[in-house]
Amino acid sequence: MNTSELETLIRNILSEQLAPAKAEVKGNGIFPSVSEAIDAAHQAFLRYQQCPLKTRSAIINALREELTPHLASLAAESAAETGMGNKEDKFLKNKAALDNTPGIEDLTTTALTGDGGMVLFEYSPFGVIGSVAPSTNPTETIINNSISMLAAGNSVYFSPHPGAKAVSLKLITMIEDIAFRCCGIRNLVVTVTEPTFEATQQMMAHPKIAVLAITGGPGIVAMGMKSGKKVIGAGAGNPPCIVDETADLVKAAEDIINGASFDFNLPCIAEKSLIVVDAVAERLVQQMQSFGAMRLNSEEIDKLRAVCLPEGIANKQLVGKSPATLLEAAGIPVPAKAPRLLIGIVKADDPWVTSEQLMPMLPIVTVSDFDSALTLALKVEEGLHHTAIMHSQNVSRLNLAARTLQTSIFVKNGPSYAGIGVGGEGFTTFTIATPTGEGTTSARTFARSRRCVLTNGFSIR
């Protein structure tokens, strides 16, 4: 018996031990209870551990190929079911998640050698990861997390937002089936028939959930922190955008409009406020109007604030709605050509500036100079360490802002979405773990770093 035949025999024996023939594997990813779903995902993980890396790679490649024809319909269904955002931008987000999320190539191996021998660092899976997906980015988060977590060798229990139930369950079923056809293992990706808040609580407390990956607001992240498990938490953001007097105003205006209007400002990385130096404020606003922004006067801003931010808190019924819908809700006439973004000059303490509203209304605050802009941006970002954007031709100022704000994503002279690999360099992620410090997540985020030491050898220098 040669080495290859021996490896095959051992793998078959281990598979039989981990999944006895008499125990029928049930389910296609969707289960009636949390316990059944997690148990199935755990059994799937035990079998998945025995697969070579090329199996993980085959699954990722198949996902990229087979999900591509469905991205547009998933985007349309997501927008329709949640009532937020628009199908065109959701398609772009789905495509970015599918094409730009790294696979097993992210699991780099590091070796150190010296007189005492060799040290090897490699990434290994955690087990079953409990992933919470939001209603703002439901399908893109599920695609992104599935690729990252499966590439790292884990199985996944998804806890979709109830407001995106139908499209999420449809996508999870598709991913589970693609993975099964690649490796013969059922239930690598699972969820429950009725995703609820109570189901999420049960998942977080389940002993077979090794790690929690939470993409959502501060409340759900805080709940996960109380579980006693390792949490990779993606919380809220309130990204400020600074424009100084050296900026290319035409490019800045276009980039800001593109970023702040993207999916009706639903992405947590999108520009939420604009802080501009007085000297160029009026010219920047005029350029923004030329790219499709509608400037509101103080009376119109007050009307809009009353319906969109009652008592300073975002009206959930208007989150992720179009500019035209916001205008109609406030009783403001909608132009014949609907605007891409609403803008208006406000004071620094306006609720539009101090709260993450997730609406296509960009408040503008004018300041005397760059130092004042940076001070205000630091205050507006509130130490969330999420995202900030700046437009300037002054490299020293750009570096100072990046160092001062300490955000997980800092975009220089581009639209905010360049920070997640859309129209910019780098990989895509929709789980930006700011509260827990991992930042932009990828496959290696969902793996354990392990150290293997061999003494007295393997240094050939």
UniProtKB/Swiss-Prot annotation:
One GO term (biological process): propanediol catabolic process
EC numbers for this chain: 1.2.1.87
Catalytic activity: propanal + NAD(+) + CoA = propanoyl-CoA + NADH + H(+)
Biotech and industrial use: Ethanogenic BMCs can be made in E.coli by targeting pyruvate decarboxylase (pdc) and alcohol dehydrogenase (adh) to them. PduP(1-18)-Pdc and PduD(1-18)-Adh strains targeted to the BMC (PduA, PduB, PduJ, PduK, PduN, PduU) make significantly more ethanol than strains where Pdc and Adh are not targeted to the BMC.
Phosphoprotein found in the keyword field: no
One MF term in the entry's GO annotations: acetaldehyde dehydrogenase (acetylating) activity
Pfam family, one: Aldedh
Sequence segments annotated as region (Targets protein to the BMC): 1-18
Keyword NAD: yes
Keywords, sorted A to Z: Bacterial microcompartment, NAD, Oxidoreductase
Uppermost EC category: oxidoreductase
Pathway named in the protein's UniProt entry: Polyol metabolism; 1,2-propanediol degradation
Compartments, as annotated in UniProt: Bacterial microcompartment
Location (main, coarse): other
One GO location term (cellular component): bacterial microcompartment
Domain comment, as recorded: The N-terminal 18 residues form an alpha-helix which targets this enzyme and foreign proteins (tested with mCherry, pea ascorbate peroxidase and pyruvate decarboxylase) to the BMC.
Similarity annotation: Belongs to the EutE/PduP family.
Assembly information from the UniProt record: Interacts with PduK, probably with its BMC-containing N-terminus. Interacts with shell proteins PduA and PduJ, interacts with PduQ.
Cited function: A CoA-acylating aldehyde dehydrogenase required for optimal 1,2-propanediol (1,2-PD) degradation. Optimizes growth in the bacterial microcompartment (BMC) dedicated to 1,2-PD degradation by minimizing propionaldehyde toxicity. NAD(+) and NADH are regenerated internally within the Pdu BMC by the PduP and PduQ enzymes, which reduce NAD(+) and oxidize NADH respectively, although there must also be cofactor transport across the BMC. Directly targeted to the BMC.
Record's protein name: Propanal dehydrogenase (CoA-propanoylating)
Organism: Citrobacter freundii
Origin organism lineage: Bacteria, Pseudomonadati, Pseudomonadota, Gammaproteobacteria, Enterobacterales
